[in-house]
Amino acid sequence: MSEPLLRVVNLEKKFPIQRGLLKRTVGQIHAVDGISFDIAAGETLGLVGESGCGKSTTARLILRLLDPTAGEIYFNGKEIHTLSREEIRKERKDMQIVFQDPYASLNPRMTVRQIVAEPLIVHGLAKDDSDPAVDEMIELCGLSREFGNRYPHEFSGGQRQRVGIARALVTRPKLVVLDEPVSALDVSVQAQILNLLDDLREKFGFSYLIVAHDLSVVSHISARVAVMYLGKIVEIGTREEIFENPQHPYTKALISAVPLANPKQERVRKTSRIVLTGDVPSPANPPSGCRFRTRCWKAQDVCATSEPQLLTIGKSQVACHFPEK
């Protein structure tokens, strides 16, 4: 089996809690706590979970926008957090990101052509925004090259996100992190953007890590899905296995909340929808044992004393003492 493009091993990130004038450390926030996964070349992995589960922190660690507390991240066979500033600069052209907010992520004083050309210029791949690769990528992302001299405020949200996608893909990176790429867009535009991303992946062989809280978004383009809860991956598997045969109670609850397009099916399913009670525990003081046990209808004594490990069940890996049968 070939080496994966990205391999994450026992990754941890803890943020200190500091108080007082002397900034005394009184605790830690366990944002990411010992997660492992990999992404193959040309593959899309969806990372899903509720707000505060650590998925966006994971994305920032992978891009080396944050330094990990522990663990390793291998990209292109290199452990990125051991690379020098110059070495990581060379790798960055192969690691790009599409941001959540198409309004805030674009410089209002730059034209579309300048925005898309910027990564090429920074990495020494072009001298200015007249490079043919700029107009080519603008058109590949569904915009006319005539838009190149316009400014971001002249476009709709969906068009701005297309500009952001063109900027991220113009260097032909190997890995693209999609941080909630459609959550700020109208529902009518979301499918268009997701289809565009999938078409470009097939054309150029990009690998995607898509971070989202909406499972319907992840199911649209992901080959595999990892479900996070309170800093831990509780289940990871193929898209079909996760959505058709979820093993972890939390995964099952998330999927039961995804609305169906057919009104009749939606009315029938409402009777079996799983409603989680209680709030998500604080990452500064996570529960002992299984972190989901405080909201789980299957929890027993062993769940409080023993932390479940990821075990292979069928085509999935699940961390649960009492997985679905």
Located regions from the model:
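P-loop NTP-binding/switch modules centered on Walker-like glycine-rich loops
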Residues: 177, 181, 185, 189-267
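A short, proline-enriched helix->beta-strand linker immediately N-terminal to the Walker B motif
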Residues: 170-174
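Conserved ABC transporter NBD signature motif
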Residues: 71-79, 91
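Helix-to-loop junction immediately C-terminal to a conserved catalytic motif
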Residues: 63
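Short catalytic/signature loops enriched in Gly
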Residues: 2-4, 18-23, 238-325
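Conserved ABC ATPase signature
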Residues: 151-155, 159
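Conserved ABC ATPase "signature" region
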Residues: 79, 121, 129-146, 255-256
